[in-house]
């Protein structure tokens, strides 16, 4: 079964900032995941419940979920390999602090 793909604004902006060839390669990898042709690796520790899509120097943090129209793949955050998890963890912490304030 094919998953519906939902991109966050950050992922959309990140993909838009890439060169056309790089953007095309990442989009192709996303479609492979949605079609069940490419597995995602689960993340652990503070990012349990999320998965990663690896492609060259980039990483995308994703999660599986449901929409009213069926199963979906949520593309949550994307960045370069060396910074993606640290930045995403910081973003999560900021959102938690704002929700409590």
Task: Label each region the model flagged.
Residues 15-17, 42-45, 64-65:
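Short histidine-centered beta-strand/loop micro-motifs
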Residues 1-29, 101:
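Arg/Lys-rich, positively charged N-terminal/basic patches that mediate binding to nucleic acids
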Residues 14, 29-32, 87-90:
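Residues that form generic nucleotide/phosphate-binding pockets
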Residues 17, 32-33, 78:
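Conserved catalytic core of Hanks-type protein kinase domains
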Residues 2-4, 55-58, 64-101:
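Enriched for short, Lys/Arg-rich terminal
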Residues 28-54:
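A short, surface-exposed loop/turn module that caps and links secondary-structure elements
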């Amino acid at each position: 079964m094919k998953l519906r793909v939902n991109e966050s604004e950050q992922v959309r902006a990140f993909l838009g900032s890439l060169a056309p060839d790089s953007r095309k390669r990442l989009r192709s990898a996303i479609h492979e995941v949605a079609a069940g042709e490419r597995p995602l690796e689960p993340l652990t520790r503070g990012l349990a419940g999320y998965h990663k899509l690896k492609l060259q120097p980039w990483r995308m943090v994703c999660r599986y979920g449901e929409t009213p129209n069926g199963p979906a793949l949520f593309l949550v955050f994307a960045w370069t390999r060396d910074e993606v998890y640290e930045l995403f963890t910081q973003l999560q912490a900021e959102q938690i602090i704002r929700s409590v304030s």
